[in-house]
């Protein structure tokens, strides 16, 4: 009985921590995410957070598609000058950054204005590498709102002056975002850094 009570109390404590963290991230990002292109301030670089081009059923992943559309729209509106795509390229047959680049070029974005980060395995890696490798202390994050909020929360920890543009969403906040935010909080608490850093790359 005592063990059951401990398990119940522990579960309640964990659930409460997850709940508080989720809403704390929302609070920290308040006023820093934008839905309208005409309202968002200009930045030199827009950071597109990676996603798989295809969903598990083989169809185009709408999270991916809407991020491509958002990045192209910001560029064409003069809100960003360069696009940095950060994503996963951990396998030979899987290359998020190149997929984004090809589709951005198809939308009329000049190839010389697109830069790729092949080791953006997770949001923390993408944000920190944008600063440490690509030399960007201020930039516009491009993803869906729930993802942008977490990215800005991470950015603030690393003294990055980030704002975000909310690409069209597919559905309300995915349940796994509650866990993703908790993991992000723990990563920051225990000072977990990117998997890889490396040589500096200038965006110009």
Mark where each language-model region is.
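N-terminal type II signal-anchor transmembrane helix
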Residues: 1-38
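A structural signal for short, hydrophobic/glycine-enriched beta-strand patches
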Residues: 23-176
């Amino acid at each position: 009985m005592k063990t059951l009570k401990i398990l119940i109390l522990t579960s309640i404590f964990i659930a409460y921590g997850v709940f508080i963290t989720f809403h704390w991230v929302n609070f920290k990002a308040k006023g820093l995410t934008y839905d309208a292109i005409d309202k968002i301030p200009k930045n030199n670089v827009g950071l597109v957070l990676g996603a798989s081009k295809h969903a598990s059923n083989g169809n185009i992943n709408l999270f991916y598609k809407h991020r491509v559309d958002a990045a192209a729209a910001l560029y064409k509106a003069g809100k960003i000058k360069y696009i940095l795509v950060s994503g996963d390229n951990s396998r030979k047959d899987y290359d998020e950054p190149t997929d984004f680049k090809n589709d951005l070029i198809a939308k009329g974005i000049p190839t010389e204005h697109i830069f790729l980060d092949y080791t953006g395995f997770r949001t923390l890696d993408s944000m920190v590498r944008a600063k440490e490798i690509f030399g960007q202390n201020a930039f516009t994050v491009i993803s869906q709102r729930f993802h942008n909020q977490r990215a800005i929360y991470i950015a603030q920890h690393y003294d990055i002056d980030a704002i975000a543009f909310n690409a069209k969403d597919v559905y309300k906040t995915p349940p796994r975002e509650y866990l993703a935010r908790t993991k992000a909080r723990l990563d920051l608490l225990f000072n977990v850094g990117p998997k890889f850093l490396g040589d500096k790359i200038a965006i110009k």
